[in-house]
Amino acid sequence: MNERYQLNKNLAQMLKGGVIMDVVNAKEAEIAQKAGAVAVMALERVPSDIRKAGGVARMSDPKMIKDIQSAVSIPVMAKVRIGHFVEAQVLEALSIDYIDESEVLTPADEEFHIDKHTFKVPFVCGAKNLGEALRRISEGASMIRTKGEAGTGNVVEAVRHMRTVTNEIRKVQSASKQELMTIAKEFGAPYDLILYVHENGKLPVINFAAGGIATPADAALMMQLGCDGVFVGSGIFKSSDPAKRAKAIVKATTYYNDPQIIAEVSEELGTAMDSIDVRELTGNSLYASRGW
C-alpha cells in the first residue's frame, strides 16, 4: 500500500506548475490540450451550471468520460461525490487517471469520506485548512486543492483557504516538538502528518488552487501565494473566447512572477464568465462547507 501511495504522489507531482481544466465534451478537451493544460477534468456540467440547476449533482456518464479519454493524450480526471466509493470504483474501472472526491457534487455520505487507500488510482481532495488537508491525506489523497467557491468566478475563498493553510503550516513549524500532540488534537489530524509539516514546512503532497479562478491574474495570484498549480472550472468555457483565455491562463501560471507577461496575455480576452459575489451565498450554496 505504501509503495502504491508513493507512486500516486509521484504521479501527482508530474502535474506541478500546470493548469487542469474542466471540460464537458471531447471538443473542449481538445481545446484544453492544445492550450497547454496538463490534465482535464471530465464532467457533464461545469460548476456554474451545477449551481444554476440545483438538485443532486452526481458522477458523470461513463460514455462521456470515455469519449474525452479517447480525444486527448493528457491525463483525464473525473469527480465523485464525497463518500461515494462505488462511483470511485466505476471510475477506476474506466481507467481514469485521477479521481476528485469533490464538494462540487452533492455529498453521498455525511459521516465518511472515501477510504482512498483501497484504490490504485490517485485521488485529489479539497481542503480549506490544514486539518482538513491532513485528514484527506491520511485517508490516501495524493493531491490537495483549495476548495474556494467553484462556479462563482470569485477567487476570494481560494485565497482565504490558501492563506489559512500557509499560516497554519507556519504555526506547526514554529511550535516546539512537545506541543505537536496538542496541535494534532486541535487540528483533528494524525500526529505523524503534523510531525512531517513541523519538520518540512509543507504538505506531504502537492497543493493546487481551485474555486473561482477566472482570469490570468487570478491564476498568477494563487501561484504567488504558494500553490503548485491551478484548476480552472467554469472560468474558461463560460467566457466569450475559451481557447484564448485557456492559453492565457496557462501562460500566466507558468510566468506567474512576470507582470509584463501577465499584462500581455490579459489583453483582449473578451468577456469573463458571469460571476457571483460569495457574500450572497448561504447554506447549501456554499460548496466549501461540504466535507469535514
From Swiss-Prot:
Q: State which residue ranges cross the membrane.
A: none
Question: Gene encoding it?
Answer: pdxS
Question: What is the name attached to this protein's record?
Answer: Pyridoxal 5'-phosphate synthase subunit PdxS
**PANTHER family from the UniProt entry:** PYRIDOXAL 5'-PHOSPHATE SYNTHASE SUBUNIT SNZ1-RELATED (PTHR31829:SF0)
Task: Specify one Pfam family.
Answer: SOR_SNZ
Role summary: Catalyzes the formation of pyridoxal 5'-phosphate from ribose 5-phosphate (RBP), glyceraldehyde 3-phosphate (G3P) and ammonia. The ammonia is provided by the PdxT subunit. Can also use ribulose 5-phosphate and dihydroxyacetone phosphate as substrates, resulting from enzyme-catalyzed isomerization of RBP and G3P, respectively.
Q: How does it assemble?
A: In the presence of PdxT, forms a dodecamer of heterodimers.
UniProt binding sites for D-ribose 5-phosphate: D22, G151, G212, G233, S234
Report residues binding D-glyceraldehyde 3-phosphate: R163
What this protein catalyses is: aldehydo-D-ribose 5-phosphate + D-glyceraldehyde 3-phosphate + L-glutamine = pyridoxal 5'-phosphate + L-glutamate + phosphate + 3 H2O + H(+)
Entry GO MF terms: pyridoxal 5'-phosphate synthase (glutamine hydrolysing) activity
Check the record and name the HAMAP family matching this protein.
Answer: PdxS
Q: In which pathway does it act?
A: Cofactor biosynthesis; pyridoxal 5'-phosphate biosynthesis
* Gene Ontology terms: biological process: amino acid metabolic process; pyridoxal phosphate biosynthetic process; pyridoxine biosynthetic process
| NCBIfam families on file | PRK04180.1, pyridoxal 5'-phosphate synthase lyase subunit PdxS
Instruction: State the family it belongs to.
Output: Belongs to the PdxS/SNZ family.
E.C. number, please?
4.3.3.6
What UniProt keywords apply to this chain's record, in alphabetical order? Lyase, Pyridoxal phosphate, Schiff base
Statement: the UniProt record of this protein carries the keyword Protease:
no
UniProt keyword annotation of Transferase present = no
- Entry annotation: catalytic residues: K79
